[in-house]
Amino acid sequence: MRRCVLEAVGVAVGIVVKGNKFLVERRRWDETVDPEIVCLPAGHVKPNECLEDALKREMMEELGIQVKEIKFVCKNFYVASNGERQHAYCYLVTDYEGEPVCKAAQEIFWEDDINKMNLEIDRKTVKKMRELQEK
């Protein structure tokens, strides 16, 4: 009998909110994975790194903000444009220091329309976040 192993990398996804808007990034055109898409800021979890630390590191690297508090929203599975399988752990950033700046993407901007994001998985994540906020 042949065994099948599903290998996937961990990805930490941050939802940064201001009023009724959430922060998105347009990935650079020269990215090898999902170039120029509009998506939530995220990044790979390093080996032996806990999810919360990965999220804090990624938000500092990509947005220049120091994350103070987070709330788990959901876990999703996604296959990137290069075939990489990802387990995406999505967190609402409830408190942070600093003002977000674009450090890694083509641009960042505040958005209120989930349909402006390219990935269905990101749209579902923001919907879930909004449902949790209403409770």
PLM regions and their residue ranges:
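Conserved N-terminal beta-strand and adjoining loop/helix that marks the start
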Residues: M1-L23, P41
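Conserved hydrophobic "DFG−1" position in protein kinase catalytic cores
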Residues: V16-V17, V24, V93, W110
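Conserved Nudix-box catalytic region and its N-terminal flanking loop in Nudix hydrolases
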Residues: K21-R57, E61
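Short secondary-structure junctions
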Residues: E62-E69
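Active-site-adjacent beta-strand/loop module that shapes the phosphate/pyrophosphate-binding cleft
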Residues: Q66, N76-E99, D113, K128-R130
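NUDIX/MutT-family hydrolases
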Residues: L92, V101-Q133
